[in-house]
A protein has these predicted regions:
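ABC ATPase C-loop
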Residues: 149-150
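Conserved ABC transporter NBD signature motif
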Residues: 58-78
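Hydrophobic anchor residue at the start of the ABC signature
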Residues: 145
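The feature captures the beta-strand-to-loop junction immediately N-terminal to the Walker
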Residues: 38-40
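Helix-to-loop junction immediately C-terminal to a conserved catalytic motif
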Residues: 53
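Catalytic Walker B motif of ABC-type/P-loop ATPase nucleotide-binding domains
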Residues: 156-160
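Conserved ABC ATPase "signature" region
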Residues: 112-128
Length: 165
């Protein structure tokens, strides 16, 4: 394994003070390591991903480090290092796949990659110029996964990545 990529110590997260979703969750991930979170519905897997993605501000932790440096999930420099594909995503419904990929690359300050091998590997050739809202759940998921893999972020977070495929 490589260097430690992400360390989260004693993370607690909630949507309301009365309902704690995560309590005392610790996690460490090495560079190039693949890890999966397994748990019952409502166990907090998606909540954990929302915290790391900077989408859930109601959390506390004893320490969060990215590549050995303390990090704030909501800061721009960390956002540019990670990409998240959520289980259900109806964002960017008026974009085609090509437009979405170009938009994401611009947001991440990366040049437009050649995603043709990924498009071919996902059997997605005929869908690249169709609005995301017109795609099936599975093909919309493919569009987001192709974008994620083409972007090559240091930290890739996938919530139920094979649902709908």
């Amino acid at each position: 394994m490589g260097e430690t990529l992400l360390t989260v110590q004693n993370l607690s997260a909630w949507y309301s003070e009365e309902k704690m979703i995560l309590s005392g969750f610790s996690f460490s991930l090495a560079e190039h390591e693949v890890a999966g979170l397994i748990g019952l519905n409502g166990a907090g897997k998606t909540t954990f991903l929302k915290v790391i993605s900077g989408l859930l501000p109601t959390f506390r932790s004893d320490g969060i480090c990215f590549c050995g440096t303390p990090v704030d999930f909501r800061k721009q420099d960390f956002k540019l290092c990670r990409y998240t594909v959520f289980a259900e995503d109806n964002s960017f419904s008026y974009f085609t796949f090509r437009e979405y990929l170009a938009y994401v690359c611009a947001a991440y300050r990366k040049s437009m990659p050649d995603a043709s091998e990924l498009v071919h590997g996902f059997h997605f050739e005929e869908y690249t110029d169709i609005l995301l809202r017109e795609l099936s759940t599975g093909n919309r998921k493919k569009a987001f996964l192709i974008t994620a893999f083409a972007l090559k972020p240091r930290l890739l977070l996938l919530d139920e990545p094979v649902n709908g495929l």
